[in-house]
Amino acid sequence: MLSMEDVKENTGFVEAHTFEEKGFRYAEAGSGPTIVVLHGLFGALSNFRSLFEHFSPHYRVVIPTLPLYTMPALKTNVKALSDFLHDFMQFKGLENVNLVGNSLGGHVALLYTSEHREKVNSMTLTASSGLYENSLGGTFPKRGNYDFIKKKVALTFYDPVHATKDLVDETFRIVNNNQHALRILHLAKSAIRHNMAKELPKMNVPTCLIWGRNDTITPPEVAEEFQNLLPKADLYWLDECGHAPMMEHPDKFNSTLSKWLSRMFIR
C-alpha cells in the first residue's frame, strides 16, 4: 500500500484530523475507548479511511505514522517500531488501548503487547505477519520492471481492480528508491527473525482475527495458527478477500470489528 510518509493524502475527514507534533505524525478523532491503528509495510493512513470514519463517532481512533523510511537503516526492525509505538503512546498518554494492526502493523501490535501487556485492552489482527508472510518486501528481483510490480501489487487483493494505477505507481516509486528499498529489506528480514510463535501462548489478551479467505501473502493457515496459539482469539473470515480486508471489504470489516468490540466490551 502507499507510504504514509511519501504520498500526499487527499482523504477528506482523515486529512482534516491529521496532526504533526514533537516528531510524530498521526490522525486522531473521536472520544471514548481508544483504538490505535497500525499500518503495514506499504501502508497508508488512507487505507483506514473507512475505519476512521466508522469508529470515531463512538471511539477515540488514533493512527500513527510508523517511521518505516526514517530510522537508521541498520536499526530498522520490528523491535524499533514497537519501541516507537511505546514512545508515541507515552507522548499521547494512551492507556488500555485496543490495537488494530494490518500486515506488519499486526506484527508490531504483537511485539508491543508481549512487552507492555498492561497497556493493551485487546488486539485485532488482520493479515498479520509474525508467523509467516510471503511478502513483496522479501526481495526485489525485478524492481525496475513496472509490470512486475503491478502484478505483485495486484496479488495483495482478491479483485485486482483495487490495485489502482496510483497504488502501483507509488509502490514502484518506493521500491526503486534505494534508501527505501534497503529499509524494506531490513524490515522484511526482521519480521522473519521476530517469529512470535513461542510468545503467543503467553499473550492472554482478547484478540479478534479478521482474515481474507483468499489472502496469498498471509494465507488462511496462518490465521488458523494464530487462533490455535493465542489463548483468547476469535477468527472471522471475509470471502473473496485478499491481504487488505479493510480496503477490499471495508463495510464487512468494520461491521465484524464493531460487533466483536461490542460483545467484548459491551458498547
Label each residue range with its predicted role:
Residues 1-35, 57-59, 73, 95, ...:
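Alpha/beta-hydrolase fold catalytic core
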Residues 19, 27, 49-50, 62-100, ...:
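Active-site loop/oxyanion-hole signature of alpha/beta-hydrolase fold enzymes
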Residues 25-71:
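Conserved HGGG/HGGXW glycine-rich cap/lid loop of the alpha/beta-hydrolase fold
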Residues 95-132:
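Conserved hydrolase catalytic core segment
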Residues 143-202:
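Conserved alpha/beta-hydrolase catalytic His-Asp/Glu region
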Residues 203, 209-211:
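Short beta-strand/loop motif that positions the catalytic acidic residue
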Residues 214-218:
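Acidic catalytic loop of the alpha/beta-hydrolase fold
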Residues 234-267:
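Catalytic active-site module of serine/aspartate enzymes centered on a nucleophile-bearing elbow/loop
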